[in-house]
UniProtKB/Swiss-Prot annotation:
This is Subtilisin-like protease 1. Residues 282-294, 378-394 have a biased composition (Polar residues). The active site is at 158 (charge relay system), 190 (charge relay system), 345 (charge relay system). It comes from Trichophyton rubrum. Its EC number is 3.4.21.-. GO terms for biological process: proteolysis. Glycans are attached at residues 233, 251. One of its GO terms (molecular function) is serine-type endopeptidase activity. Residues 34-116 form the Inhibitor I9 domain. Residues 405-449, 457-473 have a biased composition (Pro residues). Residues 126-400 form the Peptidase S8 domain.
Amino acid sequence: MGVFRFISISLAAVSAANAAQILSMPHAQTVPNSYIVMMKDDTSDDDFKHHQSWLQSTHTHNITRRATIQNAGMRHKYNFNKMKGYSGIFDDETIKDIAKDPKVMFVEPDTIVSVHGKVEQSNVPSWGLARISNPQPGADSYTYDSSAGEGITVYSVDTGVDVNHEDFEGRAIWGSNQVNDGDDRDGSGHGTHTSGTMVGKMYGIAKKAKLVAVKVLGNDGSGPTSGIVAGINWSVEHARQNGGTKKAVMNMSLGGSSSSALNRAAAQAVEQGMFLSVAAGNDNQDAQSSSPASEPSVCTVGSSAEDDSRSSFSNWGPAIDIFAPGSNIVSARPGGGSQSMSGTSMAAPHVAGLAAYLMALEGISGGAVCDRLKELGTSSITDAGPGTPTNVLINNGGAKGGQPNPNPAPAPSPSQPSEPQQPTPSQPGQPGEPFPGEPFPGEPFPGQPFPGESAPAPAPAPMPPTPQHPHTPYPGGDNFDFDSFWKKYFGGEHWRKMFSSFWN
């Protein structure tokens, strides 16, 4: 008996020494008795099933003995890529028992996550679309390639979406409700607004992309971290079964206190090939203290105002990857029509929409998308904030003489914010046809794609700074060198001599 007792005590000591950490969240708003449990990366499917069976019996025993918590037990189960885990409501003794399992990585209290946007006045001009396809603020047209995100699926992880709004043209579907409130609609308006910016016919950037609504926040704009993680899990699995994660974008215009579980889930989605656009937060503080904005593998977005300054509310710091329009943005409203909102919540969907646009246009995916956004952007932001490593504002290539087809859509009018408008050509001419003395819309030299064709993938050429384009060789320019021009674009001695006599 003495030997058995010694062995039991030794095993208990080893178990305690190897117990997983129960993380502390002193500055967060926690959900009482609700926890997120993450398993170690080497946990097999069989190990995970065994742990769940053990949890069920342990939890039942503890609850039966104490009967102190209502509606207790497992709520969400996570299982994608390397990440396995679950969330639920458990008493203190059960949590201690869970932490002792050597397959458990950590236990984290469930915290409240909120949207990063707020409603402002209605019927103000939506300037964001025009800004992302022009070199300077103040433009009133949005120039884009006709591919417009076709073939890409965008996941709106938010408050839900009014998928029947006319701006979505039937391209939006309801996906999942992780709030479990039985209310499959957007009672907040936040998710419909952000989705309109991403894929709407009038207010959207990727006007041909599909949208899937994933509700993780309630009608008050808040919800537990456990539901956010479940929404990420669901989105990744849905993407894998419907076109692939490399043709999927996830927008997360939300955030809360720093969460290892939420950051880990976001990182796993990126590792699977999805592009994640995340709002930096609206507290005018270091975004490093917020999740999922602090996750290095996502594209974290700060907000800009109409004059290209950082929005006064926008978070800043080393976590920021890029800026996008976020002040006074007009977009879709549940039930029809439009409304204006401000926040990094409004900036992130500009990035998500542009990501979908570029993925369709150039065939890129995952982490390469954020890098491409930085390449195409303009160094325009003033007062980016302490420790912020970038002042780049997103652009679709139009600011650098880039690749979009000349197919501009007028920016929404203040007097008719919800009227759909068809894209119209921005100037006359023969885009795609080289002819002497006339620059091409959006590109001052031959190479512009024919209408209806996708633009080429190479990086855009610099936009000439003046109407004369002094450093760009094209017919009719002041510094035009015909020999260099012909050798580069056409070649052939017979044709060179004939056209040389014509132009000279």
